Amino acid sequence: MRVLDLILALITAAVVGYTIALVSNSGCYVHFDGRSATTTCPPGPWVESIANGLYTAGLARPHPEPECERRQSSW
């Protein structure tokens, strides 16, 4: 997944009110638990800062770990 695609996906997910649990075809994903974001994509820190920024701005909602697992397995 290209960097721009991932950023746009994060923004789109936040704007339409979906929780953040994004998975690319490569199996890399971003999981946001309401306190911090984690990602399997290197480099992780910039992705985490975007997700944290969206949450701080009130544009993202937390979700439980199983939700991330369901989305990851369905993509």
Curated annotation (Swiss-Prot):
Lumenal side of membrane: 1-2
Subcellular location: Host endoplasmic reticulum membrane
GO CC field: host cell endoplasmic reticulum membrane; membrane
Membrane-crossing segments per the record: 3-23
Keywords: Host endoplasmic reticulum, Host membrane, Membrane, Transmembrane, Transmembrane helix, Transport, Viral movement protein
InterPro entries for this protein: TGBp3
This protein's record includes keyword Secreted: no
Main location, first listed in the record: host cell
GO terms, biological process: transport of virus in host, cell to cell
Further information: TGBp1, TGBp2 and TGBp3 seem to act together for cell-to-cell propagation. TGBp1 is the main movement protein that physically cross the plasmodesma with the viral genome. TGBp2 and TGBp3 would facilitate TGBp1 function.
Function, in words: Plays a role in viral cell-to-cell propagation, by facilitating genome transport to neighboring plant cells through plasmosdesmata. May induce the formation of granular vesicles derived from the Endoplasmic reticulum, which align on actin filaments.
Protein family: Belongs to the Tymovirales TGBp3 protein family.
Protein name: Movement protein TGBp3
